[in-house]
Amino acid sequence: MENLKKMAGIKAAEFVSDGMVVGLGTGSTAYYFVEEIGRRIKEEGLQITAVTTSSVTSKQAEGLNIPLKSIDQVDFVDVTVDGADEVDSQFNGIKGGGGALLMEKIVATPSKEYIWVVDESKLVDKLGAFKLPVEVVQYGAEQIFRRFERAGYKPSFREKDGQRFVTDMQNFIIDLALDVIEDPIVFGQELDHVVGVVEHGLFNQMVDKVIVAGRDGVQILTSRKEK
């Protein structure tokens, strides 16, 4: 599995060229993309500027001497490469297993090209088997939790080291065990209107390409948005 992730990450780095502003994703597959960008800077003299989607990725990039700017210091991002936890046939996805969904979506939005790198196990007919993360402000988080409970969404607060997990933006994450999301667009809109929800892990019709590594090699899926 790790080898598949590495294959996808290295393939994605081929979409990066000199002079670009590059969004560096977060997670186990995006990790290999960041490593490959670091290698190309060191060995090939690749010249780029990068923005990151989490403190974890910032630390990795700094260790590789990748030049960084904050998202507010750039007008746009040429290409962002990130992982995904699930991708359906309509190019909707669930992200945020690593807890960086808000920053990931902020960087994805001004990106001219948005690419996901996944292994083939992440491709699904319908989203929902992977728990859907919802980032909420700390104030009133229990109210939101109970609302989700009443709706039958089987919520749970994400924890780390026995404490509630706190995101880089100092928010909590409530994971929803939905099993199946029949209409990700409609459900995303519902979550958008819940007061106290900062962001959710549904990335609907945002991605341009999905690089999939499988036993038969690497394939690139292109969304209708890109065609």
UniProtKB/Swiss-Prot annotation:
Binding site for substrate: 26-29, 82-85, 95-98, 122
Keywords: Isomerase
KW Isomerase (keyword) present: yes
Catalytic activity line of the entry: aldehydo-D-ribose 5-phosphate = D-ribulose 5-phosphate
Gene Ontology MF terms in the entry: ribose-5-phosphate isomerase activity
Domain of life where this protein originates: Bacteria
InterPro entries given in the database record: NagB/RpiA_transferase-like, Ribose-5P_isomerase, Ribose5P_isomerase_typA_subgr, Ribose5P_isomerase_type_A
Xref: Pfam families: Rib_5-P_isom_A
Involved pathway(s): Carbohydrate degradation; pentose phosphate pathway; D-ribose 5-phosphate from D-ribulose 5-phosphate (non-oxidative stage): step 1/1
Signal peptide location: none
Entry EC no(s): 5.3.1.6
Active site: 104
Role according to the record: Catalyzes the reversible conversion of ribose-5-phosphate to ribulose 5-phosphate.
Similarity comment: family membership: Belongs to the ribose 5-phosphate isomerase family.
Protein's name according to its UniProt entry: Ribose-5-phosphate isomerase A
Species whose genome carries this gene: Streptococcus pneumoniae (strain Hungary19A-6)
